[in-house]
Design a protein with these regions (language model features):
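N-terminal pre-triad scaffold of radical SAM enzymes
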Residues: 39, 49-93, 99-125, 187
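Auxiliary Fe-S-binding modules of radical SAM enzymes
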Residues: 1-48, 115, 247, 253-387
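Conserved strand-turn element in the central/C-terminal portion of the radical SAM core barrel
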Residues: 122-132, 153-164, 191-197, 204-205, ...
């Protein structure tokens, strides 16, 4: 029986393009790819070839393990001072009656609805509301921790934090320290979109730039917090913009080691200012996941956000470098459903997630936010699994 590396070596021998052969052997030998080589993967690599290489790297890092967690989302508001072209979610302050604004009491009601349930994480992100200030969110963090100290709070993109800090006249260091002391445990990856100014200027010119986003994550890492990172793909960007974005993330990861997971996010074109742009194909989606796994050699995990992709496509990514399927979600997010995502009421029971992972030939492992193993579900009977 051939080993995984033997199988990939055999596949490489069928590649006629010398530039791809060189890249393939670098990957087999664990060598870092250059930016130009990342672009070459996108432009020239066949899907089967990319998938085999990405799966080789994935299995070298994680074997058959596929992680998931039990989590829920709170979205405090969709009222937002910014006007991103790709966003189907936000409403301007002048039209806030069309959106929602949750009080701390309402958000605590959501938290308390999970009392006695085995969730390990609450994920809090939303629009940038001009009246929801730093003190409001510090009080929210303190309230959650006082009620349920064991619940990991992953909250606030750099877009939200940058606005909070500037309004409160705080430095990034001061603001992050205050949030951390109030109960913030880690940062999600949102708000990154595309770092390259050529694209960022066209799709989200008025919010925090790439340097600001990276500075907030760097500061979080320096405080001992971990975070995730995202990239919004499939709109007006070119392949070199994607690689530039991943290169900046890779450099910060070399510096701090604080990123856990990279999450490619597919652009959806429903009800936004970019609805004239066709969405990417399944083939392009899988290409994005595979190249992400190959280029981001220092990121431990690549995640498929199943509410955005849909269950079956997310399952397919497990053959293209992905080793994390996110969480149960429990129909608690509207950010992508309002943009036309595959899952309009995103919720999966733990048993459904376990079965989805098993049917792809992978080993389902429930994790905490920081990838501590909560439970191995490889041999657990589905009917015995709690929702």
């Amino acid at each position: 029986m051939q080993s995984s590396s033997d199988s990939v070596s055999a596949l490489l021998s069928y590649t006629q393009d010398p530039s791809l052969q060189k890249i393939g052997y670098k990957i087999l030998n664990g060598e870092r790819l250059q930016e130009s080589e990342g672009v070459t993967l996108f432009e020239k690599g066949s899907l089967s070839w990319l998938g085999a290489l990405a799966n080789f790297v994935r299995e070298k890092k994680h074997g058959n393990i596929t992680y998931f967690n039990r989590n829920f989302h709170i979205e405090p508001t969709n009222v937002c001072v910014f006007n991103c072209s790709f966003c189907s979610y936000s409403r301007g302050y002048a039209h806030r009656e069309e959106g929602w604004e949750l009080s701390i009491e309402q958000m605590m009601h959501i938290v308390k609805s999970y009392d006695g349930k085995p969730v390990t994480e609450v994920h809090i992100v939303g629009g940038v509301h001009p009246k929801m200030n730093m003190e409001f969110f510090l009080e929210l963090l303190r309230s959650i921790k006082a009620h349920r100290p064991d619940l990991h709070i992953k909250a606030f993109t750099p877009v939200e934090l940058d606005y909070m800090f500037r309004k409160a006249k705080l430095t990034v260091q001061e603001g992050m320290q205050m949030a951390h002391e109030a109960g913030l445990d880690s940062l999600p990856g949102g708000g990154a979109e595309i770092f390259h100014p050529e694209i960022r200027k066209q799709i989200c010119d008025d919010k925090v730039d790439a340097d600001g986003w990276l500075t907030i994550h760097r500061t979080a890492h320096q405080l001992g917090m971990h975070s995730n990172a995202t990239l919004l793909y499939g709109h007006i960007e070119a392949y070199h913009h994607r690689i530039d974005h991943m290169e900046r993330l890779r450099q910060l990861q070399d510096e701090t080691g604080g990123f856990n997971t990279f999450i490619p996010l597919k652009f959806r074109n429903k009800d936004n200012d970019m609805q004239h742009i066709p969405e990417s194909s399944i083939i392009e989606d899988m290409r994005m996941y595979a190249v992400s796994r190959l280029y981001l050699d220092n990121f431990p995990h690549i995640k498929a956000y199943w509410p955005m992709l849909g269950r079956q496509q997310a399952q397919l990514t497990l053959s293209f470098g992905v080793n994390d399927m996110d969480g149960t979600i429990d129909d608690s997010t509207k950010i992508y459903s309002m943009a036309g995502s595959e899952e309009q009421s995103p919720t999966m029971t733990t048993a459904e997630l376990v079965q989805l992972i098993r049917s792809a030939g992978r080993t389902p492992i429930e994790r905490g936010t920081l990838y501590n193993v909560v439970k191995d579900y490889s041999t657990v009977a589905l009917e015995s699994i709690d929702a």
